[in-house]
Amino acid sequence: MADRKEQKRVNAEKRQENWVDRLVSVNRVSKVVKGGRRFSFNTVVVVGNEDGLVGTGLGKANEVSSAISKGADDAKKNVIRVPMRDGTIPHKVVGKQDAGKVLLKPASPGTGVIAGGGVRAVLECAGYRNVLTKSLGTSNPHNQVKATINALAETEDALEVARRRDIPLEKVFNG
């Protein structure tokens, strides 16, 4: 499985794409020091080109704006290519990250992206137009985003399945 994920990774620095970035969450954290509390921020950011490339990143800094830019830079380093068929995913898949599970199902044209929060951000940045989702488990946005990325990394196009099984493409659908 690790080989497939590495195979899908795309070197974002070589590609000069028009990235769309979405801020999923901003979290203020505090550290208690001798003089009181010291606040810092962490952000979860999703970037994509709305054409099959998507990545997620976590940024931490003392100011919100620098945490967002660090998160976007981190997301561009973790970009994967995801398969798409008629604006939806090729098949039903469940992604897991810690206590978070996300179920993704293909949808017919005109349905739209039925998702909430971080899951919607990932799917829209990837370029999906019709997907049904269900978040099972945690409501933590960071784990939801990572579970969605894991689910998308597990999806396979029909051509990949045909090549792997060494059968013609028609046999994939007709058995």
Swiss-Prot record:
SUPFAM superfamilies, A to Z = dsRNA-binding domain-like, Ribosomal protein S5 domain 2-like
Q: Which GO terms describe its cellular component?
A: small ribosomal subunit
Per UniProt, the keywords (alphabetical) are: Ribonucleoprotein, Ribosomal protein, RNA-binding, rRNA-binding
- Record flagged with keyword Ribosomal protein: yes
Report whether Ribonucleoprotein shows up as a keyword of the record: yes
Residues annotated as domain S5 DRBM: 19-82
**Entry protein name:** Small ribosomal subunit protein uS5
Source organism per UniProt:
Salinibacter ruber (strain DSM 13855 / M31)
The organism's taxonomic lineage, starting at the top: Bacteria, Pseudomonadati, Rhodothermota, Rhodothermia, Rhodothermales
